[in-house]
Amino acid sequence: MTTATIDSSSGNGPLVSTTEQLQGLIESFIELGVLVHDNQGTQQSHTALTHKTNQVISQLSSLTDSGFTHQYPIPVDVISYIEDGRNPDVYTREFVEVTAKSNARLKGKMLGFQKLRDVLGDKLGKEFPELGSAIEDIKKRTTPDEE
């Protein structure tokens, strides 16, 4: 069962390849689970179980040796979510929510400091008119460029 599909293009070839490797690995784990559950204790079932275990080890090894998997490290939190049986999309959603809250807080701080700069500059300009050009220079240098 896949939750999303990846379009095959020249730019994401390694991603598609890794996705296919992971899908094959998941299938092998499912088949291995079935073999373990249905194990009769016979030589034939032992051979099938050994073969499937070696296949899983081989697939894990090829996935680990892939350069693409080292290029994009997976956060430990995501692995913990998966190990706990939770959906890793929950981690992504929570990460985005925390980042949005942090960005909103920082934006509020920036706006507060801009207002402080403007009010302080106006008050200083009224009290010390001879500093007017320096105050305007500071305001101009500390005002973010609007694009």
UniProtKB/Swiss-Prot annotation:
CC annotations in GO: mediator complex
Cross-referenced InterPro entries: Mediator_Med10
Pfam family, one: Med10
GO molecular-function term, one example from the UniProt record: transcription coregulator activity
Predominant location category: nucleus
Compartments, as annotated in UniProt: Nucleus
Swiss-Prot/TrEMBL GO biological process terms: regulation of transcription by RNA polymerase II
Keyword field: Activator, Nucleus, Transcription, Transcription regulation
Top-rank taxon, per record: Eukaryota
Family per record: Belongs to the Mediator complex subunit 10 family.
Subunit organization: Component of the Mediator complex.
Function: Component of the Mediator complex, a coactivator involved in the regulated transcription of nearly all RNA polymerase II-dependent genes. Mediator functions as a bridge to convey information from gene-specific regulatory proteins to the basal RNA polymerase II transcription machinery. Mediator is recruited to promoters by direct interactions with regulatory proteins and serves as a scaffold for the assembly of a functional preinitiation complex with RNA polymerase II and the general transcription factors.
Descriptive protein name: Mediator of RNA polymerase II transcription subunit 10
Species this protein is from: Debaryomyces hansenii (strain ATCC 36239 / CBS 767 / BCRC 21394 / JCM 1990 / NBRC 0083 / IGC 2968) (Yeast)
